[in-house]
Design a protein with these regions (language model features):
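A flexible loop/linker signature enriched in serine peptidases of the S9 family
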Residues: 1-8, 24-41, 53-63, 72, ...
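Predominantly a core beta-strand signature of beta-propeller blades
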Residues: 48-53, 99-103, 145-146, 188-192, ...
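Short coil/turn segments that connect the beta-strands within blades of beta-propeller domains
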Residues: 17-19, 70-72, 120-122, 163
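Short loop/turn segments that connect beta-strands within beta-propeller blades
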Residues: 44-48, 95-99, 140-144, 183-186
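Non-catalytic accessory segments flanking enzyme active sites
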Residues: 1-3, 9-27, 127, 146-228
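Short, ordered coil/turn segments that flank beta-strands lining enzyme active or ligand-binding pockets
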Residues: 16, 46-47, 69, 97, ...
Length: 228
């Protein structure tokens, strides 16, 4: 832990009571090289009990565990197709007491790369790819309703504390710029407070070209997006 070669701190999370942690683990074996079957294991903090596989029923990838603030729910991301590492991650909620799981937003076709619960556990804040960008979204845990909070670029990382979010956002014209804002007043990036300068502000003598997004119909009548 973390998993190789691309694992990180989001591969594991501590339970709020500090007595255990949950980690995304792929058990070594003959098929480990091509398998995508990562499971979530509950691990006793004192090592007095054997690890328990919480997601044995899913033969695909389970990742990114995080507890609700009260410890009653374990949120995580899960793929459904074994061996297909480009599968969509679904947002999942597991009742810690019963082990029952459900998909939070089954109608949402985006694949979140990170998630963090709100202070009361009623919502998840996630970053997910969306037509060439990585916006920040709010997902209602009860209804699955999805709201885009920050667009116009890619949110590479974020942290939520109470009503405040701090995030790093980049675009084709600039590397990461740090912003903060209130979660109650965000809307497509409005009301963000810029903390660090953009590339243009750092390099006033450099001309950064403009860009725009375009789309066209591709194979299977699918919409293909690009930049020019």
């Amino acid at each position: 832990i973390p998993s190789k070669p691309f694992g990180g701190a989001d591969d594991y999370t501590w339970a709020p009571d500090g007595r255990s942690l949950v980690a995304s683990v792929k058990v070594a074996g003959r098929e480990a090289t091509w398998s995508t079957n990562f499971d979530l294991y509950r691990i006793d903090a004192l090592g007095e009990a054997a690890p328990v596989n919480l997601t044995a029923a899913n033969p695909a990838w389970d990742a990114g565990p995080v507890f609700s603030p009260d410890g009653s729910t374990l949120f995580y991301r899960a793929m459904k197709r074994p061996g297909f590492e480009a599968d969509r991650y679904a947002l999942m909620a597991m009742d810690v007491a019963s082990g029952q799981t459900r998909e939070i937003a089954p109608r949402w076709d985006r694949s979140p790369s990170s998630l963090q619960p709100s202070a009361d556990g009623s919502a998840l804040y996630v970053a997910a790819q969306d037509t060439g960008e990585y916006p920040l979204f709010r997902v209602d845990v009860a209804t699955g309703d999805v709201t885009k909070l920050v667009a116009d670029g890619s949110v590479s990382s974020f942290a939520v504390a109470g009503d405040t979010v701090a995030l790093a956002r980049n675009s084709i014209r600039s590397g990461d710029v740090i912003y903060t804002g209130s979660l109650q007043s965000l809307g497509d990036g409005a009301n963000l407070r810029q903390i660090t300068p953009t590339a243009a502000e750092r390099l006033p003598d450099v001309a950064f070209g403009d860009f725009e997004q375009f789309s066209f119909k591709g194979a299977g009548n699918e919409t293909v997006h690009g930049y020019v």
